[in-house]
Design a protein with these regions (language model features):
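Positively charged, low-complexity intrinsically disordered leader regions
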Residues: 3-9
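Conserved beta-strand core positions
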Residues: 4, 26-28, 54
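Amphipathic alpha-helical interaction surfaces in cytosolic regulatory modules
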Residues: 11-27, 35-50
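C-terminal structural segments of small proteins and small subunits
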Residues: 46-70
């Protein structure tokens, strides 16, 4: 699993990120403090505090798909 820090500053950023995550074959998770949500869920991602830096964990195989949005 790879880990990356991201900032999603606008709703458009969230939409773009979730669309990219949906294309991934494996699980993509977003972490903030003790909260973990599925990155393929727009409601889950929107429920996080988007003013903070989030941590994304994903498989090496999906790196190419996500790289453009991270």
């Amino acid at each position: 699993m790879l880990e990356r820090k991201i900032r999603l500053n606008a709703v458009a950023d969230v939409k773009e990120f979730v669309r990219a995550a949906e294309k991934c074959e494996y699980d993509v998770d977003v972490f903030y403090n003790r909260v973990v949500v599925d990155a393929k869920s727009i409601l889950g991602v929107m429920s996080l505090d988007l003013t903070k830096t989030l941590t994304v964990k994903y498989c090496k195989e999906d790196e190419e798909i996500l790289e453009g949005t991270l």
